[in-house]
Amino acid sequence: MLAEAVAPYGGIIMWRAFVYNPTSSDRANQAVEEFKSLDGQFADNVIIQIKNGPIDFQPREPFSPLFGQLYNTPMMMEFQITQEYLGFSNHLVYHGTTYEECLDSDTYRDGKGSTIAKMVKAIAGVANTGQDPNFCGYIFAQSNWYAFGRLAWDPTLSAEQIANEWIRQTFIKPKGITPTAYEQNFLIPVKDMMMSSRETAVNYMMPLGFHHIFGGSHYGPGPWENSIRRPDWSPVFYHKADKNGVGFDRTRNGSANVDQYHEPLASQFNSLETCPESLLLWFHHLPWDYKLSSGRELWDEICLHYDKGISQVEEYKKMWAKLKPYVSESIFNEVSEKLDIQKNDAEWWRDALSLIHI
């Protein structure tokens, strides 16, 4: 109906595939359950807008399986530019690496090489601007707008190339410093911070496939929260921690979400031997003493990830202190204050998640 109404004016309908029925046992399954049977039935001026992951812009998710299940319907990507689940405008988290990871993912829909970048016809971004002079509340948050725009025009670009471009266009080389010294002592350290920042956030928020264990504000942790209104709004619904273990079973013995992916991914995710450890608790419910590739038990590995994330933010603080001669006083102070907040928040996450072990 909507597509027919706008068609005479050259209009298109971008229809979001964000579905979460409260009666479902697994929200990750719902987009495919809703849209796969409708493939090819939409008007020519309709495009289905799919979030990068199957839940909701988490620090790390596998790509949405719906990208591999529509053959006769145009698809577009929905990324999040703002940091709803990644520390708002207080944390240094560069989204370029997240976008690149998703766009380069192989769905195997038409065989090997069926990457998401080759399939999508457009890209949308969920953003949040304010009255701050840089619109974003944090100078480093601007890099996510830039990364989104560059990848929208050319999805083959690397996150590192985009970070290099943004840094050179954002910061001005001080007088009296040679280009070589500026690159070695400022550009490269800032780029290294940006390129590692997403993984740092994953470490101190939700490592090893943890997801949706935020408090109601989506800013801080809330693994104890249990919504009365809807189970699938609750962190306990997703981490499923009990005395026996932790994690969401999406294997063939659980919600069978793995089988919404094409082979070899379905079997890879289903098997503990081949599932990437970065997604382990996304697809598997495991005992606390499960041994990982490091030889450590699961609970010990979880704790080490949180400690590592905090240490990484501490390194950012030390690095930024060395960069004071290269930026204005206002920029230096802003970033220093934000990194202090980020470190405190990382410790908050670690302390809160220690309560998950029953």
What is the meaning of each model-derived region?
Residues G111-I356:
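Catalytic domains of carbohydrate-active enzymes that cleave complex glycans
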Residues M1, I356-I358:
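Accessible peptide chain termini
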